From Swiss-Prot:
Family membership: Belongs to the FGGY kinase family.
Catalyzed reaction equations: glycerol + ATP = sn-glycerol 3-phosphate + ADP + H(+)
Root EC class: transferase
Protein name: Glycerol kinase 5
Organism domain of life: Eukaryota
Leader sequence residues: none
Described function: Skin-specific kinase that plays a key role in glycerol metabolism, catalyzing its phosphorylation to produce sn-glycerol 3-phosphate. Involved in skin-specific regulation of sterol regulatory element-binding protein (SREBP) processing and lipid biosynthesis.
Localisation per UniProt entry: Cytoplasm
Pathway membership: Polyol metabolism; glycerol degradation via glycerol kinase pathway; sn-glycerol 3-phosphate from glycerol: step 1/1
One Pfam family named in its UniProt record: FGGY_C
Protein's GO biological process: glycerol catabolic process; glycerol metabolic process; glycerol-3-phosphate biosynthetic process; triglyceride metabolic process
UniProt: ATP binding residues: S28, S29, T297, G340, G440
Length: 528
C-alpha cells in the first residue's frame, strides 16, 4: 500500500483561521484528499493506492474494510499536512468511482461481500442473455414505434437501451441470484444496497444515514433520468426490490455529520457526487455547451446539455450532472477505455522510465514512421462499440524503435479523442462553448496539442488536474456558504495552459486514415 502526503508553501496563518473544506476522491486506482482554503488553494494532500482483488477470472473486487481504513487515513494525513486542526474543517465533499457497489446487513452494518467493481465481468452471460432476449427486442420495437409517433426522447432512450456489465443492474441481479445470505436478507427486508458514496455515508454516520445523490444514481442503470427517480420498469424486469435502494438526494446537500468518534469532531458531510460529474463541476462547466475531456485510466468526454437528458445512437448516454435545489444539470457522456492503461503498459515494457518522458520522446520525431497503435485492451467503446477488439501495433519495421512505439501510443489517444468529439458533434446538437481538460494524461502536451489540432478547438488545461476532488470540495463549499455562488468558483479556477490549433486537419488526414484501417483490422478479434 503506497501513500504520500504533501503540503504546499502557501499555507498561511491568516487562511488557517478562515476555515477549510475537504474534497475526497475515491477512484478506481487511487484515493485522494485535498484540503482547500477560501482561495481554492490546496493546503495539504494525501493519497493512497486502491488495491483491486481478482478472486476469479473476470471478477474485480475491492475490500471494503481496507477502503474504509484508507478513506479515514487520507483525511487525517491531509489535515496534518495542511498544519490545521480537524475542527477547522467546515465541510466534506466526497467524489467516488461510479457503479461499484456493495450490500450489507441493515441491522448490523456487516457487509455480505466485497465491493463489486464497475470493471467486474461476472454478469457477462446475464448481459448477453438479456440483450438478446425476445422481451428486450419487443421493448425496443415498441419504443421505436412510440418514438415515431410521439417524438418523445424518453421512448428514443428506451428503444436504444441495452444492459452492460458496467451498469450496476445486472451485477446486482447476479448477486441476488447467487448469494443465499443476500437472498435471505432481502426476504427479511434486512438488506441495504449502496454504491461507494452510500456505503461511506453509512459508515461515516455510524449507520444513521442511508442516501445517494442524483449523479451517482444516474450511473447505475437503475435510474430514470427523465422521471428523476429509480426506474420501476428496470427494477421490476430484474426483480430488484425498490426497498433495497437508497433515497436520492441533491448533490450539494446536508447529508448529516461524521460521527465524532472517527475524527474527534462532527464534520458536516455536504456533498456526494460521482467522479466524472465532480470533475465537470470542478472545471466550472456550468453552462449548456461546456465540454470536459478527462484523460485518466480511460477517456471521458462530457457535454453540459442543460436540463434536458440527451440520448444518442452512437454511444453518448444521458446522466445527471448534479442537482442543487431546483437546478438540475444533465450531461451527455461517452468514453474510450485504455488511455492511461496504454501508457502504463508501455512503461511496464520499459519503453520509458517515467510517463513524463513520453512527451519529449514523441516530439523528437517527425512522425511514427507508419507505426499505429490500437488502444483496445478492454475492447473499443463509442463510436465503434466492439468489445471483441484487440490491442495491437501495426506497421512495425526493422527500423522501428521505442520512440516510434511511444509516439504511436500517444497519437492513438488523440485519434480516439477526435472520434469521440466527432460523434458528439453529430449526435448531440448543442454548440460547444468551451473545452476543458483534466486527468493525469492531460499533463502530456503532445497529446493535448494534437487533440486541439484534430478537433480544431481551443482546450484549456488547469493548474490542478485532480478535478474530481476540486468538484467535490466546490459542491461542499457551496452547501455551507464557504463560497457564495458558482460565479465565485469561476474566478477561483486557475488555467495553466491553453492549447490552440496549430496544424490543419489535412496534415493529419492520411495518418488518421491509416490508423482507422489498423483499428478495423483489430476489430472482432476475440470470439467473446
Amino acid at each position: 500500500m503506497s501513500e504520500q502526503s504533501t503540503v504546499p508553501e502557501q499555507s498561511a496563518s491568516d487562511s488557517r483561521r478562515a476555515g477549510f473544506v475537504l474534497g475526497v476522491d475515491v477512484g478506481s486506482s487511487m484515493i485522494r484528499c485535498h484540503v482547500y482554503d477560501r482561495a481554492a488553494r490546496i493546503c495539504g494532500s494525501s493519497a493512497q493506492k486502491v488495491e483491486s482483488l481478482y478472486p476469479q477470472p473476470g471478477w474485480v473486487e475491492i475490500d471494503p474494510d481496507v477502503l474504509w481504513l484508507q478513506f479515514v487515513a487520507v483525511i487525517k494525513e491531509s489535515v496534518k499536512a495542511a498544519g490545521i486542526e480537524t475542527n477547522q474543517i467546515v465541510g466534506l465533499g466526497i467524489s467516488t468511482q461510479r457503479a461499484t457497489f456493495i450490500t450489507w446487513d441493515k441491522k448490523t452494518g456487516k457487509h455480505f461481500h466485497n465491493f463489486i467493481s464497475w470493471q467486474d465481468l461476472r454478469a457477462t452471460e446475464l448481459v448477453k442473455s438479456w440483450n438478446g432476449s425476445l422481451l428486450m427486442k419487443l421493448i425496443h420495437s415498441s419504443c421505436r414505434v412510440l418514438h415515431f409517433f410521439t417524438r418523445s426522447k424518453q421512448f428514443l432512450a428506451a428503444s436504444l437501451f441495452t444492459f452492460t456489465t458496467q451498469h450496476v443492474s445486472l451485477r446486482l441481479a447476479w448477486i441476488l441470484q447467487n448469494l443465499t445470505e443476500v437472498q435471505k436478507a432481502v426476504e427479511e427486508e434486512n438488506c441495504c444496497f449502496g454504491t461507494v458514496d452510500t456505503w461511506l455515508l453509512h459508515k461515516l454516520t455510524k449507520g444513521s444515514e442511508f442516501a445517494t445523490d442524483f449523479s451517482n444514481a444516474s450511473t447505475t442503470g437503475l435510474f430514470d433520468p427523465y422521471e428523476m427517480c429509480w426506474s420501476k420498469i428496470v427494477t421490476s424486469l430484474l426483480s430488484i426490490p425498490l426497498s433495497l435502494l437508497p433515497p436520492v438526494k441533491d448533490t450539494s446537500h446536508n447529508f448529516g455529520s461524521v460521527d465524532e468518534e472517527i475524527f474527534g469532531v462532527p464534520i458536516p458531510i455536504v456533498a456526494l457526487v460521482a467522479d466524472q460529474q465532480a470533475a465537470m463541476f470542478g472545471e466550472c462547466c456550468f453552462q449548456t455547451g461546456d465540454v470536459k475531456l478527462t484523460m485518466g485510466t480511460g477517456t471521458f468526454l462530457d457535454i453540459n446539455t442543460g436540463n434536458n437528458p440527451q440520448q444518442s445512437v452512437g454511444g453518448f448516454y444521458p446522466l445527471i450532472g448534479w442537482k442543487i435545489g431546483q437546478e438540475v444539470v444533465c450531461l451527455a457522456e461517452s468514453n474510450a477505455g485504455d488511455t492511461g492503461t496504454a501508457i502504463e503498459w508501455a512503461q511496464q515494457l520499459d519503453l520509458f522510465t517515467d510517463a513524463a518522458e513520453t512527451e519529449k520522446m514523441a516530439q523528437s520525431l517527425e512522425d511514427s514512421e507508419g507505426v499505429y497503435f490500437v488502444p483496445s485492451f478492454s475492447g473499443l467503446q463509442a463510436p465503434l462499440n466492439d468489445p471483441c477488439a484487440c490491442a495491437s501495433f501495426m506497421g512495425l519495421k526493422p527500423s522501428t524503435n521505442k520512440y516510434h512505439l511511444v509516439r504511436a501510443i500517444l497519437e492513438s489517444i488523440a485519434f480516439r479523442n477526435k472520434q469521440l468529439y466527432e460523434t458528439m458533434q453529430k449526435e448531440i446538437h448543442i454548440p460547444v462553448r468551451k473545452i476543458r481538460a483534466d486527468g493525469g494524461v492531460c499533463k502530456n502536451s503532445f497529446v493535448m496539442q494534437m487533440t486541439s489540432d484534430l478537433i480544431n478547438e481551443t482546450i484549456d488545461r488547469p493548474v490542478h488536474i485532480d478535478m474530481s476532488c476540486s468538484g467535490a470540495a466546490s459542491l461542499a463549499g457551496l452547501a455551507v456558504g464557504f463560497w457564495s455562488d458558482k460565479e465565485e468558483l469561476k474566478k477561483l479556477r486557475q488555467s495553466e495552459m491553453v492549447f490552440k490549433p496549430q496544424k490543419k486537419w489535412q496534415e493529419y488526414e492520411v495518418n488518421m486514415g491509416n490508423w482507422v484501417k489498423a483499428v478495423k483490422r483489430s476489430m472482432n478479434w476475440y470470439k467473446t
